Regions:
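Divalent metal-dependent phosphate-bond-processing catalytic cores, especially two-metal-ion Mg2+/Mn2+ enzymes
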Residues: 1-5, 17, 65-143
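Alpha-helical phosphate/pyrophosphate-handling elements in metalloenzyme active cores
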Residues: 1-11, 37-45
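His-Asp-centered metal-binding catalytic motifs of divalent-metal-dependent phosphohydrolases/nucleases
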Residues: 8-26, 30-34, 54-64
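Alpha-helix C-capping/helix-to-loop hinge sites
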Residues: 20-23, 41, 45, 62, ...
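An amphipathic alpha-helix signature
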Residues: 32-39, 56, 109, 113
């Protein structure tokens, strides 16, 4: 965020709150519920309304699967950081797919390949550069 001249405070707060609705088990619309929760919380703390708007935009648009465009550099930073998190926990993804989901080898490979491909494709170029080696390595393992 800093390297891209984004408002670091907005990105940090959005990153802390972007998945907050998952606590209540809301996965499908957690971006919508999370943005509403963030607005209520930050308003109750007397936070600046312009920054609240930016934070809500970040949270609403952080999921690539929703089709909600990331209009600000802060939103792009959050979406990229969210996608990058998968590359910090590669073994966890394998465990989840094979142990928790019980996938067979080929089905699991396809799920993992798809997840990492989607994550990589939604990143801004600066983020891609940071995880490129891991992305290439995961794809080689899955060949």
């Amino acid at each position: 965020a800093e390297k891209l001249n984004a408002d670091v405070e907005v990105v940090v707060i959005a990153s802390l709150l972007h998945d907050i609705a998952r606590i209540d088990g809301l996965n499908e619309n957690h971006h919508i519920e999370g943005a509403q929760y963030a607005e209520k919380l930050l308003n109750s703390l007397g936070y600046d309304s312009e920054k609240i708007s930016l934070i809500k935009d970040c949270i609403l648009s952080h999921r690539g699967s929703t089709g909600i465009p990331q209009k600000t550099i802060e939103a792009k930073c959050l979406a990229s950081a969210d996608a990058m998190a998968h590359f910090r926990s590669i073994p966890d993804m394998f465990y989840f797919v094979y142990k928790d989901l019980g996938c067979d080898i080929e089905e699991g490979k396809e799920k993992i390949r798809k997840k990492f491909s989607e994550s990589y494709s939604k990143m801004i170029p600066e983020a891609k550069a940071m995880v490129e080696e891991k992305y290439i390595a995961v794809m080689k393992v899955l060949e």
